[in-house]
From Swiss-Prot:
UniProt feature, compositional bias: Basic and acidic residues: 724-736
Chain ranges inside the bilayer that never cross it: 291-301, 320-328, 471-480, 484-492
Residues with the Phosphoserine modification: S14, S16, S18, S656, S735, S738, S741, S828
Name by which UniProt lists this protein: Autophagy-related protein 9A
Higher taxonomy: Eukaryota, Metazoa, Chordata, Craniata, Vertebrata
């Protein structure tokens, strides 16, 4: 079998965004004409503060929010100390009588102050408790640290406040109503006036995103390449994902900004990590550092655990009492947020996408309620509700019933039981259509593994999607367990990957002039990191391990071009967007629809629009998703994908330039063909409304267009995967401790694998084509549920694969040109200069 090494390679600079003659530009300004914002040294921190102040709606809101955070921490510590040392619970529970009268026979009411101990007694009990004193001292030191940091941040944000007022000319009262694109456009203009960055004459939108999201882009790439230990197989639970805020904080502490991290400062990777000569020594140093941080986490585990429990109790106890079903609701997991995030996507942009996908995701997960669990919940709710109704009726008749011991507690518990049981009872009017719901979810979240399509009705797909969209109760439980589990993950799981992490940062870091060291994936260069099966065939030179998985490069490029219509992409990216535009035009014309790309109207479309959307862009998505199930006779399985793609292409063609004074619409009678705009503008579409629509409306249409592009690109990828089923996916080798590739012995005979090999982020095998009776059964499921067919069920000749040393798949007899260059030995690259990527 064919074997080849899968070592990371050094990337070469692929393009230069600098205008001619500005490659080595250093802008000099006379001393007397410098503004207060000329040559800001730490632009990463500066732009991050500008963005944070915008997201927090101004200086006043940010100031008050920070003050309340300090007060909240102080309240949790003080109130917990009071409950532990200053309350007489015997009086509170009526185990001890209190006599306020001279006549013992007279009845006396017990008040709350009666249960409070005197100040002297309370102080003495606190002083006698050594453990409590230790916790209070640590909490006090931490609070003083936060107070000093708060004062420092206020001084820094006051400078940002002045920058908004004088440089950007945006008053604080208007800031909550300005979009980030408006603020960003003014920053670009301010660069021309004040020379914020002296290394470039002009700033681009991508420069600002790189500054704000430098470390976040690295985290997205690490998750995309499956280098962080986030997946574990537990007995009885199977494969689980564990990624909490505490674990993420430790990852960032180790890699980015902590003492001894890989970065010299916010914008520069240390020089020794850019060369391969000391990779083993650096890996050992990183491994030791991870060990010490893991030990520190283990020592601080009791304090962090106590804080997590107290904070969770004070945060969710009232919510649980008021809305017992709140913990049964779902939320996007931290792993899901990182897996679904585009390169160069700000937090509010990600949150907006996930918010749009929340309702269809909830409906999809509700489709899988167990019939047995539903039956038990109905009967449990009946019995609990019957007892609760009797107690409520007795209380209405005579309120003295509440004075009986445990009656109020029983009423509360029965109410919680009824509410929880109702959350497991599905709506009797709900229609089971998981395929359509999954397509709606895909339109908003933009990413999903290949083997989900056509298998939306399977429990395996449901379980994997639950890793992205988890119960709120599971989220809280993971955060509570985080102080205990995090040290174990750091010491036993992250340390063996130290060498791979060192290689990753060396080979996937480029130095951009005027920006600093950035993750090469964040350049969104389809030539360096594109995937052949994601419209990059013939346009990419990336090897297997250089390719971003799940179409991350292509979808991120499309998202950034739509979100920032003024951005001028490099040549390769422009060619990719132009190719996609031409493909949209061809498929839209082949759809056989009306001249303007108008989707046919019928009663079902109108009802779906009225039920699923309140705005025209969302109704267009509803039309596209529901179209194939509601229009025309059923097609063969191999033709359904073509019809899906044609419908999405027709919808994309309906995004056309608006004439002055024309109302915004998703069904303009003209198409983008011959509109005269360049490939990027035509592909994004949203730029043609600039200056004619308000920013919020423009953002809504841009989001809708990106949703349609995501559906369209996934359909193209699916058809290319069917034509070329062998998908080359990067996988790390679990047993590789040195990072160097070692050939793995394979059998002599050819062995067939699943038509769509497992994904890096979701390494679960797709269903194999089964026996005839299995195929017939799947056909029955397809007739029942509708939607996209499973490409894995299409009969085809078996393909021959060989197992890569790091877990990927390679076709037998693959060309030797795909072999990467071996990593040099110790000291072989000591004299090589660091890689520079001029932009």
């Amino acid at each position: 079998m064919a074997q080849f090494d899968t070592e990371y390679q050094r990337l070469e600079a692929s393009y230069s965004d600098s205008p001619p003659g500005e490659e080595d530009l250093l802008v000099h300004v006379p001393e007397g004409s410098k503004s207060p914002w000329h040559h800001i040294e730490n632009l990463d921190l500066f732009f991050s503060r500008v963005y944070n102040l915008h997201q927090k709606n101004g200086f006043t809101c940010m100031l008050i929010g920070e003050i309340f955070e300090l007060m909240q921490f102080l309240f949790v510590v003080a109130f917990t100390t009071f409950l532990v040392s200053c309350v007489d619970y015997d009086i509170l529970f009526a185990n001890k009588m209190v006599n306020h009268s001279l006549h013992p026979t007279e009845p006396v009411k017990v008040t709350l102050p009666d249960a409070f101990l005197p100040a002297q007694v309370c102080s003495a009990r606190i002083q006698e408790n050594g453990s409590l004193i230790t916790i209070l001292v640590i909490a006090g030191v931490f609070w003083v640290h936060r107070l000093i940091k708060f004062i420092y941040n206020i001084c820094c944000y006051w400078e940002i406040h002045s920058f908004y007022l004088h440089a950007l000319r945006i008053p604080m009262s208007a800031l909550p109503y300005c979009t980030w694109q408006e603020v960003q456009a003014r920053i670009v203009q301010t660069q021309k006036e004040h020379q914020i960055c002296i290394h470039k004459r002009e700033l681009t939108e991508l420069d600002i995103y790189h500054r704000i999201l430098r470390f976040q882009n690295y985290m997205v790439a690490l998750v995309n390449k499956s280098l962080l230990p986030l997946r574990f197989r537990l007995p009885g639970l199977g494969e689980v994902v564990f990624f909490t805020r505490g674990l993420k904080y430790n990852f960032e502490l180790i890699l980015f900004w902590g003492p001894g991290s890989l970065f010299l400062n916010e914008w520069s990777l240390k020089a020794e990590y850019k060369r391969g000569g000391q990779r083993l020594e650096l890996a050992q140093r990183l491994s030791n550092r991870i060990l010490w941080i893991g030990i520190a986490n283990f020592l601080l585990c009791p304090l962090i655990l106590i804080w997590q429990i107290l904070y969770a109790f004070f945060s969710y106890a009232e919510v649980l009492k008021r809305e017992p079903g709140a913990l049964g609701a779902r939320c996007w997991s931290l792993y899901g947020r990182c897996y679904l995030r585009h390169f160069n996507e700000l937090e509010h942009e990600l949150q907006s996408r996930l918010n749009r996908g929340y309702k269809p995701a909830s409906k999809y997960m509700n489709c899988f309620l167990s019939p047995l669990l539903t039956l038990l919940a109905k009967n449990c709710a009946f019995f609990a509700g019957s007892i609760l109704a009797v107690l409520i009726a007795l209380t209405i008749y005579d309120e003295d019933v509440l004075a009986v011991e445990h009656v109020l507690t029983t009423v509360t518990l029965l109410g919680v039981t009824v509410t929880v049981c109702r959350s497991f009872i599905p709506d009797q009017h709900m229609v089971f259509c998981p395929e359509q719901l999954l397509r709606v979810i895909l339109a908003h979240i933009h990413y999903m593994p290949d083997h989900w399509q056509g298998n939306a009705h399977r429990s395996q797909t449901r379980d994997e999607f639950a890793q992205l969209f988890q119960y709120k109760a599971v989220f809280i439980l993971e955060e509570l367990l985080s102080p205990i589990v995090t040290p174990l993950i750091l010491i036993f799981c992250l340390r063996p990957r130290a060498l791979e992490i060192i290689d990753f940062f060396r080979n996937f870091t480029v130095e951009v002039v005027g920006v600093g060291d950035t993750c090469s994936f964040a350049q969104m260069d389809v030539r360096q990191h594109g995937h052949p099966q994601w419209l990059s065939g013939g346009q990419t030179e990336a090897s297997v391990y250089q390719q971003a998985e799940d179409g991350k490069t292509e979808l991120s490029l499309m998202h950034f071009a739509i979100t920032n219509p003024g951005w001028q992409p490099p040549r390769e990216s422009t060619a990719f967007l132009g190719f996609l535009k031409e493909q949209v035009q061809r498929d839209g014309a082949a759809a056989g629809l009306a001249q303007g790309g108008l989707l046919p109207e019928n009663a079902l479309f109108t009802s779906i629009q009225s039920l699923q959307s309140e705005s025209e862009p969302l109704s267009l998505i509803a039309n596209v998703v529901a179209g194939s199930s509601c229009r025309g006779p059923p097609l063969p399985r191999d033709l359904q994908g073509s019809r899906h793609r044609a419908e999405v292409a027709s919808a994309l063609r309906s995004f056309s330039p608006l004439q002055p004074g024309q109302a915004p619409t998703g069904r303009a009678p003209s198409t983008m063909t011959g509109s005269g705009v360049d490939a990027r503008t035509a592909s994004s579409g949203s730029s043609v409304w600039e200056g004619q629509l308000q920013s919020l409306v423009l953002s809504e249409y841009a989001s809708t267009e990106m949703s349609l592009h995501a559906l369209y690109m996934h359909q193209l990828h699916k058809q290319q995967a069917q034509a070329e089923p062998e998908r080359h996916v990067w996988h790390r080798r679990e047993s590789d401790e040195s990072g160097e590739s070692a050939p793995e012995e394979g059998g002599e005979g050819a062995r067939a694998t699943q038509p769509i090999p497992r994904s890096a982020s979701y390494p679960c095998a797709a269903p194999r084509p089964g026996a005839p009776e299995t195929t017939a059964l799947q056909g029955g499921f397809q007739r029942r549920y509708g939607g996209i067919t499973d490409p894995g069920t299409v009969p085809r000749a078996p393909s021959h694969f060989s197992r890569l040393p790091l877990g990927g798949w390679a076709e037998d007899g693959q060309s030797a040109s795909r072999h990467p260059e071996p990593v040099p030995e110790e000291g072989s690259e000591d004299e090589l200069p660091p890689q520079v990527h001029k932009v």
